[in-house]
């Protein structure tokens, strides 16, 4: 079968790779001049398979009020827009801020995340996929507030494989935290989690795909229209050319919303803007070897070979991916206070990207309402973590096979 995939970030590339592995011909379409130049370019790097709790949770609305008073220092910032889409998304987000809803969605995400880890392992072992700074280094979520620690501990279940640590044990796991020991209340450790460079992963997938005669890449081309006949998409229009297809996968991140609106498909996806720094290492002893998430400041740290990736923040503020220097300054200050001397944060490479998120925090994988149009969108901050599993499940369904794990709670409602 001939399958077109729109979007060449980590979700689209993983989908294309899985489809080609399963014997399909793939046309991968990307509006930028190269792959993985947007949300997949400089994200947090953590493959957080066991710590997958959605942003929407009990207590977040009240916290958000306090955060809004902090301005550029706030982990989450809301800037109202004259947009019905934004306000509707925010209302759905508030409705999802219940503990029961959070736990249910976290279970769906954990199921998908653990499958995604298995698929990446199989690709690495069976295909010798490497060259993207992958390590199995574990993840440590540190807490500076006792109430937050108790809340996090209550969410640990047997399947997650997580362990509750006191402050001294946190330092044992990650000695680079020694200067912070007095301010820590404890942590949650996930020894099975991993790290990798998402952009390098994408370029390696592309290199493998280009070796296949079943793969064709279209870059620098925007989709002009989708030609439909009844409940089927017959072709993707690129400029003056029609690309005839048997199936279409939309994996265009936040761009999926506008792309599908003319077909009457209203995706509940909104961009959550995040920021990152990529820092050249200066002092190896001050750089964390383990993935570290500072829960109270909402900052993640991941070592990628000879660099430290620092990522943070959620701006619910529209579709502009430009850098906000006040937010960058906050990130530099927090990183300097947490891992001083690890590198020169003032000279770090700065980046901002738009995470395509649903209000509930769960992605939309599978059917769209059209017979041959499929979705793989809405992964939020977990796109890299969930990419391989999402790709495997969707390519199985497209090929007529049952998915390896249930897509319950991970699809567009009928």
State where each predicted segment sits.
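N-terminal Rossmann-like FAD-binding beta1-loop-alpha1 element of flavoenzymes
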Residues: 2-28
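Active-site substrate-recognition segment that forms the wall
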Residues: 43-46, 51, 55-95, 225-228, ...
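Rossmann-like flavin
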Residues: 87-204
């Amino acid at each position: 079968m001939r399958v077109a995939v729109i979007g060449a970030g980590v979700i689209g590339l993983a989908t294309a790779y899985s489809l080609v592995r399963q014997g399909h011909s793939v046309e991968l379409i990307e509006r930028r001049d190269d792959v993985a130049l947007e949300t997949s370019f400089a994200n947090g790097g953590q493959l957080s398979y066991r710590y997958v709790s959605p942003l929407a949770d009990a207590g977040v609305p009240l916290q958000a009020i306090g955060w809004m008073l902090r301005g550029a220092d706030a982990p989450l910032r809301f800037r109202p827009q004259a947009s019905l889409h934004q306000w509707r998304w925010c209302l759905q987000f508030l409705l999802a801020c219940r503990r029961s809803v959070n736990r249910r969605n976290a279970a769906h995400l954990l199921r998908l995340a653990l499958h995604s880890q298995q698929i990446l392992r199989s690709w690495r072992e069976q295909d010798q996929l490497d060259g993207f700074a992958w390590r199995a280094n574990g993840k440590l979520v540190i807490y500076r507030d006792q109430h937050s620690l108790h809340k996090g501990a209550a969410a640990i279940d047997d399947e997650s494989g997580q362990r509750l640590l006191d402050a001294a044990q946190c330092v044992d796991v990650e000695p680079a935290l020694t200067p912070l020991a007095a301010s820590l209340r404890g942590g949650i450790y996930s020894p099975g989690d991993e790290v990798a460079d998402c952009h390098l992963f994408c370029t390696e997938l592309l290199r493998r795909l280009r070796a296949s005669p079943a793969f064709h890449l279209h870059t620098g081309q925007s989709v002009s229209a989708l030609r439909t006949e009844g409940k089927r998409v017959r072709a993707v229009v690129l400029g003056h050319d029609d690309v005839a297809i048997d199936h279409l996968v939309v994996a265009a991140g936040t761009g999926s919303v506008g792309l599908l609106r003319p077909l009457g498909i209203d995706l509940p996806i909104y961009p959550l803007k995040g920021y990152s720094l990529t820092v050249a290492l200066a002092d190896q002893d001050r750089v964390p070897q383990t993935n570290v998430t500072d829960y109270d400041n909402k900052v993640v740290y991941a070592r990628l070979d000879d660099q430290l990736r620092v990522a943070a923040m959620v701006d619910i503020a529209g579709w502009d991916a430009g850098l906000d220097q006040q937010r960058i300054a906050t990130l530099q200050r927090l990183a300097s206070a947490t891992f001083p001397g690890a590198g020169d944060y003032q000279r770090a490479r700065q980046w901002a990207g738009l995470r395509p998120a649903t209000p509930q925090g769960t992605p939309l994988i599978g059917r769209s309402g059209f017979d041959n149009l499929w979705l793989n969108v809405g992964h939020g901050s977990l796109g890299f973590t969930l990419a391989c599993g999402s790709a495997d499940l969707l390519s199985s369904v497209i090929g007529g096979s049952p998915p390896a794990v249930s897509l319950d709670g991970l699809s567009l409602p009928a």
